Each structure stands twice: as structure tokens, then as C-alpha cells.
Amino acid sequence: MSNALVTKSNHLVEAGYKLSLNEQRLILSAITQLDGRKPVQRENDFIITAAEFSETFNIPIKQAYSTLEEASSRLYERDIKTFDHEAKTRGRFRWVDSVKYWDGEAKVTLSFSHSIIPYLNLLHQQFTTYELKQVSQLKTAYAIRFYELLVQFIKTGERYISLEKLREILEIKNQYKRFYDLKKYIIDPSINNINSSTNLTVDWDIVKNGKAITSLMFVFQKAQ
């Protein structure tokens, strides 16, 4: 796992989707098996074993069995929403075409959907890459999403993101409507987790338009 890399198109980093923590881990584990410089074939199956999952995410092997089974059981229904505000288009597609849990072998096999493959074939695209181990100890799917959104801008060390866009990306438009709740339950726990468990140190602040909070500003760097 030490050298396993997650590489995604920036469009995928900023897409709207909601996965559980372990569904997210399952997808990321499969992505590390790709070589983004080579075409991904639709029929390719990717294998994630309970032993590998246990080692990567530091969970007991028996827990890894049930975790993989549960995460794989819902993965086929999970979708992604893409936004192109300039072209005024929206897309929606599944993560996977197929997913199987092999009870006797304690493993999952999955194949990515035809529609997501262009976001994983990284030739001629802007993309974000990071080591899987950096997010392996994050405790929520939201923390993983924040890490990806920040590391996408690691060269500048700054990122502004509107609350509207953040809610769209995290698919929480109708949740945590008060900023106090958004900060308490999503932002603060995610950033604190990133600061304690990854290679980033992050500070953040609000941006206002008059009295209204409209955006968030993040300043970050790789920890020394």
C-alpha cells in the first residue's frame, strides 16, 4: 500500500456524490490498481481482498470481511453527478457496471461503468494524484472529499470554494442549512481529522458578502 496512488480527473474530484466511508475506500482501492496512462477496458475486473483492505485501512480482518460485504452490497446503486456550469449541462451515471462479493474467498470484484472510464483515463486531462495511505486513517467520507478538494490545489496552497458548490459536491443541499451546523458536523471534524492523520496542515476561514457567509477559504501545505 505504501506506494499505492489514487489518480482522478479533476472533474471527478469536483463531482457530486455521496458514498459511505467504506464504499469510498472500496472505490479508492480499485482506482489504485489503474494505470491512468493506459486505456481502461470496460470489462476489466478489479479485485479487493479482505486481507488487503484490513492492512490498508488498519481494521481487524474479521471486520474487513463484513465491511467489504456491506459496502459492495450498495455500491451498484451509487451514482455520480457532474456539472458543467459554462456549458450548462449536468450528467448522472453509476460508479460500477458490476460488483460481486465472494463469500468463500473474502474478496470483492468490480468493474467500473462505461461512463466513468473517461474520468479515469487521464491522457490529455487535468488530474489530481495522491497516496492512498494519506486518507487511509480518515474517519469519514466527508474528510476524504475535503482532502481531495484541497490536494487538487497543492501547488498554490490555497482554495476558495463557495458554500453552494460545496453543498453540491457533498450532496448536502438540504442538510445542515445553518452554517453553525455545517461547521460543527462537517467542516471542523473533517479538517481536524486531516490535520491529525494526513500529510496536510490546513487552516480555513469564512468569506462574507455583507453579513452573509458565501464561501470558504482554505490555506494549506504539506506537513514538514
Walk through the language-model features, giving the residues of each.
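Charged, alpha-helix-forming regions
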Residues: 1-224
